Amino acid sequence: MRLAILTDIHGNVQALDAVLAELDRQQVDEIWSLGDMIAMGPDSNEVMARLLDRGVHMITGNHDEAVLSLLEGKGHPESYVHTRPHHEWVARTLKPVYADALFKLSRTIERDVKGTRVYGIHYHIPTEKRGVPITEEPFHDIVEATLSNMQSLYGAYEADVICFGHHHPEHVFRDDAKHYFNPGALGVARDNLARYGILEWDETGFAIHLRAVRYDKRAFLEAMERNDVPQRDVMFRLFY
């Protein structure tokens, strides 16, 4: 059994296509996408088309939910005020069929695979905020990637493997009870690597693999310019 873990694709269809081609060669059994499929990059519609066509199991992230909140007329998170012009552009250009698909998604996913409880979430949400909208800032602030911090965030989760994203660098930690796995952002990096992860089971147990594949970053950057993506200069400086 091979379960692929993707997160933070962020509208980067070039990076996603490179990863999907790799997954085809590896013959994975299931794919999860742990939120932030859309926004930042120029091709949110194309990304959603690929994921739906592949039957990828998706959950929402903060960018997805911020765009959906605008589409519903329910406002925009105060802490994301700097991203509002960009999110408004995504909301205007996102095709209704893909918005509808995003509206149907949950914030979490879980599966028992050969006795291993696997749980996916975009990032930790405190218990008291599990049901609140994105305008009430449900996702925990990003913390430094250390084992003790992961234990503080996810230690009470009833699972053996906690998979998440949001914080773009990859990190893998383990204690006696749990594995904490962030494969890294697929679509946002300084280099030209698209990152993802594989959980693999055999007769002896399971293993976690970090993976990365090169993609055509020049084509991605050209698409950002061609599509006149709002706030792209800021994103180039901070993320790409």
Where are these regions (language model features)?
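Beta-strand-turn-beta hairpins that frame and shape the catalytic cleft
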Residues: M1-A4, E110-Y119, D175-Y180, G205-A207
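N-terminal active-site segment of His-dependent metallophosphoesterases
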Residues: M1-R54, V229-Q231
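Active-site neighborhood of phospho(di)ester-bond hydrolases with catalytic His/Asp-centered motifs
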Residues: L6-T7, I31-D36, H57-N62, I121, ...
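Active-site environment of divalent metal-dependent phosphoester hydrolases
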Residues: H10-A15, A39-G41, H63-S69, P126, ...
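Metal-dependent catalytic neighborhoods of phosphoester/phosphodiester hydrolases
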Residues: M37-R54, V67-S79, F173-D176
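Active-site neighborhood of divalent metal-dependent phosphoester bond hydrolases
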Residues: R54-R111, F139-G155
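Anionic-ligand binding region
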Residues: Y123, V132-V172, H179
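Acidic, His/Gly-rich catalytic cores of divalent-metal-dependent hydrolytic chemistry
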Residues: V161, F173-Y240
